[in-house]
């Protein structure tokens, strides 16, 4: 933690200098806007313009370290849930058809992500989700509705011996996974960014924990 001495500028204005390392990291320059928000405990939170904090890092996934295509798919889902926007999947040799098909299948089940570049040895996935367009309560409600319908369809298919209804329930399961992974991504992003948490409707950090529990039980179909 760094300390700064409060200086008086003019008749009544108080000022505090910003840490140089932080201003360089955030690429702050003269004339830029910074935003102050008061926390519930009285602390002040300083943030830069929303566009400046965009994560442009490329996260690497080495296929050679994945035992099979299922593990590869799980790794991609994990990176998506953690809020990563650009994921490069690569191998020291030509990607196998099974691996490519696994990547394509999993990206079809993840909202807002797609393949933007491809070669024999790598694929680049990019997620273009704007968290502010997904209010948390709306996403949670959607997950609840899907799982409720899926449960009813499953029970009715067993009672009536209706195979078509059973197939509908399986389709709902895939849709529930998609919404659950989106919800998990939003909550992970909210933990990392106050701007995201405010954008999706979280006012108290404890809400993140509560919604994580709700999401887990809402998608638990054991």
Where do the language-model regions lie?
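Cytosolic, long alpha-helical scaffolding segments
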Residues: 2-6, 11-13, 17-222
């Amino acid at each position: 933690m760094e300390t700064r001495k409060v200086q008086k500028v003019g008749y009544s204005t108080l000022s505090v200098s910003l840490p140089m390392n932080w201003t360089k990291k955030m690429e702050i320059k003269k004339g830029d806007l910074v935003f102050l928000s008061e926390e519930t405990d009285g602390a002040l939170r300083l943030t830069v313009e929303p566009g400046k904090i965009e994560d442009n890092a490329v996260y690497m996934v080495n296929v050679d370290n994945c035992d099979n295509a299922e593990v590869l798919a799980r790794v991609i889902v994990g990176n998506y849930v953690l809020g990563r926007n650009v994921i490069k999947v690569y191998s020291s040799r030509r990607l196998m058809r099974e691996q490519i098909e696994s990547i394509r299948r999993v990206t079809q089940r993840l909202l807002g992500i797609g393949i933007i570049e491809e070669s024999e040895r790598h694929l680049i996935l990019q997620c273009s989700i704007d968290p502010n367009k997904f209010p948390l309560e709306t996403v949670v409600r959607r997950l609840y509705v899907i799982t409720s319908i899926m449960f009813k369809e499953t029970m009715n298919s067993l009672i009536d011996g209706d195979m078509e209804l059973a197939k509908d329930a399986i389709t709902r399961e895939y849709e529930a996974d998609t919404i659950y992974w989106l919800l998990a991504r939003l909550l992970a992003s909210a933990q990392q960014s106050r701007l995201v948490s405010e954008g999706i409707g979280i006012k108290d950090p404890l809400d993140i924990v509560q919604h994580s529990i709700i999401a887990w039980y809402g998608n638990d179909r054991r």
